[in-house]
Amino acid sequence: MPAMKVAVLGAGAWGTALAGHLAVRHDTVLWARQPALIADLRASHENARYLAGVALPPALRYETDLNAALDHALADNALCVVATPVAGLRGLFRAMRDAGKVPAHVVWLCKGFEADSQLMPHQVVAAELPEHGSNGVLSGPSFAREVGQGLPVALTIASASAACRERTVAAFHHGAMRIYTGDDVVGVEVGGAVKNVLAIATGIADGLGLGLNARAALITRGLAEMSRLGVTLGGRAETFTGLTGLGDLILTATGDLSRNRTVGLQLAAGRTLDDILGGLGHVAEGVRCAQAVLAIARAHAIEMPITQAVCAVLFDGVAPRDAVSALLRRDSKAE
């Protein structure tokens, strides 16, 4: 496929890194609502706030006007990439609808559940754009900084639309980035949400010095929690042993570039959640969606003790070591 027109909506670390990758091959525009951020990007071709030290391609263009960015994605050979957190997803799709500028092919990158509604991202999109069919989620084990540096990465595009899958592969599958395809949107989104919560748990355990045995147990039993929830919600079991399940969980739980793991490490060190989030400078989706994950699990009578322990530490004032002790006191059971 020839060069495409791509609009990336959201200039955080992940949106910036992917826009840089796309601009190597395609006519790419990166949109953000903050004029000062866009001015800095135009002047330096570096996102000093969210991805400092990563040089962006000279061909990448920047835009603060959402309508102009959407116009770019309305071309025949175009793709719209939504790189906002879950909290901003509904508002952005509503703005597309209200402006009458809905791109034909849209993929989103966010991981989590909408806090108030407890909806998955694809459900939020369907609520705002019920007639839109060529859309999906791009996910997998990936740190923005490594992608920005051109290091190898493998991601999955999950969509019910073959056209969306093909368009996404055509846009992203080049250089050091490999794209796999599938249609299990539910499984991919559940994996992306739950792994962030589990990464907080692993960070707590590592911060308490509980050792590699404990880390392996948390990852493995956490994967079981993820799979139970995902299959109940309509995902396929095999999705959770793939890139967007086990792969993303391993990366986020063990990699020190992980914001969610960092939250766990710092909670174990005795810092308060407000203090941690204030100094993080980026969104930690595991904190935002932990309560939604637990509420959904309880509504379906699904046992998720690790997720419950994370929520107890985050929101109920339970000390990290006490939460671990409560997990260890649980009765033995069949694996």
Curated annotation (Swiss-Prot):
Pathway: Membrane lipid metabolism; glycerophospholipid metabolism. Pfam families: NAD_Gly3P_dh_C, NAD_Gly3P_dh_N. InterPro entries: 6-PGluconate_DH-like_C_sf, 6PGD_dom2, G3P_DH_NAD-dep, G3P_DH_NAD-dep_C, G3P_DH_NAD-dep_N, NAD(P)-bd_dom_sf. Keywords: Cytoplasm, Lipid biosynthesis, Lipid metabolism, NAD, NADP, Nucleotide-binding, Oxidoreductase, Phospholipid biosynthesis, Phospholipid metabolism. PROSITE patterns: NAD_G3PDH. Its EC number is 1.1.1.94. GO terms for cellular component: cytosol. GO terms for molecular function: glycerol-3-phosphate dehydrogenase [NAD(P)+] activity; NAD binding. It is an enzyme of class 1 (oxidoreductase). NADPH binds at W14, R33, K111, A144, R259, V283, E285. Its main location: cytoplasm. The active site is at K195 (proton acceptor). Catalyzes the reduction of the glycolytic intermediate dihydroxyacetone phosphate (DHAP) to sn-glycerol 3-phosphate (G3P), the key precursor for phospholipid synthesis. Belongs to the NAD-dependent glycerol-3-phosphate dehydrogenase family. This is Glycerol-3-phosphate dehydrogenase [NAD(P)+]. The gene is gpsA.
